[in-house]
Swiss-Prot record:
EC id: 6.3.4.2
Pfam families: CTP_synth_N, GATase
CC annotations in GO: cytosol
Taxonomic lineage from the root: Bacteria, Bacillati, Chloroflexota, Dehalococcoidia, Dehalococcoidales
Pathway: Pyrimidine metabolism; CTP biosynthesis via de novo pathway; CTP from UDP: step 2/2
GO BP of this protein: 'de novo' CTP biosynthetic process; pyrimidine nucleobase biosynthetic process
Substrates-to-products reaction catalysed: UTP + L-glutamine + ATP + H2O = CTP + L-glutamate + ADP + phosphate + 2 H(+); L-glutamine + H2O = L-glutamate + NH4(+); UTP + NH4(+) + ATP = CTP + ADP + phosphate + 2 H(+)
NCBIfam families tied to this protein: PRK05380.1, PyrG
Sequence ranges assigned to domain Glutamine amidotransferase type-1 in this UniProt record: 299-534
Annotated residues for binding of Mg(2+): 71, 141
Protein known as: CTP synthase
Subunit-structure text: Homotetramer.
EC primary class: ligase
Gene for this chain: pyrG
Molecular function terms, GO-annotated: ATP binding; CTP synthase activity; glutaminase activity; identical protein binding; metal ion binding
């Protein structure tokens, strides 16, 4: 039977629950335990697939095609596992299912209430993940902050889980912020005390409190929180701000979190072995020259919109013995001012995914700059599509080339709607989503990067390369180096004779790991580090 770790957050949002949960999974896995993770999101959207990147940040896609919170990407990267749709639960999903059951008559005419019907549905989804994953430990993060109205049913559900599963099988961890008052130069514990009191009113007594702070925490604060929050002194965990998020598992382990979890849950675990992870962190902290990459995007004001891309660049830089400097370039600025001002100093250009026509011409201009100046280029999803459009416009001199996403009546639609998408009006969960196989052509940049003939990558798109133009572009120097097994869909294209110019219709950033960078990102940074523009770049911190 699985054991359960429930993680809540207090005082403020964005306190670091997601990284804490990912780090707990890392620690438990280092002790030979199998781990699965789940995120409970209280918002009423069914999933974040139709949410604005400015509202939600990145949409992370699982292997089976679920559109999820970016925290699931952190879980996968830290624990090195692949999650499924069972790992994401939203209020929208829960309430939709409860209402559907009521309409079918499943409740036999009963009055439908938050307790017990909504809470039972939440608990059923938690238990479903445990049953299907058969993990030794299931870690469940409750999104939002204690006190949020929409989070109340989820907190009530996890409160009930301890009675349902037994006290030795459930543990509660509360992640909270200790704010620093500059005028008095002290950390304050009162917000944490109030947050814990709110949890206790609901019926949840935290077993462990993880205290986030930007300044050193004294032992006196540990004593105070232990007294007022009724938590053992050794279970008050200090988590200071660190230079790289990948150091968090080491900090938590040094605070004794792993031993606490094993003891409280009576786990049959091996001794902790974080030696490989420790070596990774040491490598990250080594001062090395930086490689400077321009990320040209639509949503660069909110960097979390490209969270997995950013982390994948960091992973590739680690592997190549470099730090990373990312220039966040707004595509519309290139449209207004031209590319030179933004791209003249960079050693590589990457264009990630996105939707809509805004900024497209700026992206096409950036691709042209990379192609003509021999600057390594990596295009992801939309980034591949604008690469094809640019090639058709400026190499084939077909200035009307476009995507039907942006110009439905284009006379030269090199990018077109997938056949199965025609007639689909609903936006939510209807794209080509999740893992699909791809056959790599030997003797290509992609072939050199992967070293395998058959790969599986994650997708999230409606539009695809138009095969009517495959022969024409191929004769002009575009190489179609990755195809679907039936040869009908172009998955990877590249420009022959260029140091590195590769576009993928899929999202390779979802499969990169800190100790195993994705092959396309690895080779992109390898090519970029060889480019010298205005001398070597200064060493910069790895985590942006």
């Amino acid at each position: 039977m699985s054991k359960f770790v429930f993680v809540t957050g207090g005082v403020v949002s964005s306190v670091g629950k997601g990284i804490t949960v990912a780090s707990l999974g890392n620690i438990l896995k280092s002790r030979g335990l199998s781990v699965s993770v789940q995120k409970l999101d209280p918002y009423l959207n069914v999933d974040p697939g139709t949410m604005s990147p400015y509202q939600h940040g990145e949409v992370f896609v699982t292997q089976d095609g679920a559109e999820t919170d970016l925290d699931l990407g952190s879980y996968e990267r830290f624990i090195d596992i692949e999650l499924t749709a069972d790992s994401t639960v939203t209020s929208g999903q829960v309430y939709s299912e409860v209402i559907n059951k009521e309409r079918r008559g499943d409740y036999l005419g009963g009055t439908i209430q938050v307790v017990p019907h909504v809470t039972q549905e939440i608990k059923a989804r938690i238990q479903r993940l445990a049953d299907r994953s058969k993990a030794d430990v299931v870690i469940v993060e409750v999104g939002g902050t204690v006190g949020d109205i929409e989070g109340q049913p989820f907190l009530e559900a996890i409160r009930q889980m301890r009675n349902d599963m037994g006290r030795d099988n459930v543990i509660y961890i509360h992640v909270t912020l200790l704010p620093y008052i500059q005028s008095t130069q002290e950390l304050k514990t009162k917000p944490t005390q109030h947050s814990v009191n709110e949890l206790r009113r609901i019926g949840i007594q935290p077993d462990i409190i993880v205290c986030r702070a930007d300044y050193p925490i004294s032992e006196g604060i540990r004593d105070k929180l232990s007294l007022f929050c009724d938590v053992e002194r050794k279970a008050v965990i200090f988590m200071p701000t660190v230079s790289t998020i990948y150091e968090v598992p080491l900090k938590l382990e040094s605070e004794g979190v792993g031993d606490l979890l094993v003891s409280r849950l009576h786990l049959n675990a091996s001794p902790s072995d974080l030696s490989i992870w420790r070596g990774l962190v040491e490598k990250i902290k080594e001062p090395t020259p930086a490689v400077r990459i321009a990320l040209v995007g639509k949503y660069v004001e909110l960097k979390d919109a490209y969270y997995s891309v950013r982390e994948s660049l960091c992973h590739a830089a680690i592997h190549n013995g470099r730090d990373i400097q990312i220039d966040w370039v707004y595509a519309e600025d290139i449209e207004k001012n031209g590319p030179e001002e933004y791209l003249k100093h960079v050693q590589g250009i990457i264009i990630p995914g996105g939707f809509g026509i805004r900024g497209i011409e700026g992206m096409i201009t950036a691709v042209k700059y990379a192609r003509e100046n021999g600057i390594p280029y990596l295009g992801l999803c939309l980034g591949m599509q604008v690469m094809v459009i640019e090639f058709a416009r400026h190499v084939l001199q077909s200035d009307k080339a476009h995507s039907t996403e942006f110009e439905p009546d284009s006379p030269y639609p090199v990018i077109d709607l997938l056949p199965e998408q025609r007639g689909v009006d609903s936006k939510g969960g209807t794209m080509r989503l999740g893992n699909y196989p791809c056959v790599i052509q030997p003797g290509t940049m992609a072939g050199q990067a992967y070293g395998n003939k058959l790969i599986n990558e994650r997708h999230r798109h409606r539009f695809e390369f138009n095969n009517d133009y495959r022969d024409t572009l191929s004769k002009a120097g575009m190489v179609f180096s990755g195809l679907s097994p039936d040869g009908k869909l172009v998955e990877i294209c590249e420009v022959s004779g260029h140091p590195f110019m590769v576009g993928s219709q899929f999202h390779p950033e979802f499969l990169s790991r800190p100790n195993r960078p994705h092959p396309l990102f690895r080779e992109f940074i390898n090519a970029a580090k060889k480019v010298i523009r205005d001398g070597e770049q200064p060493s910069l911190p790895l985590s942006p």
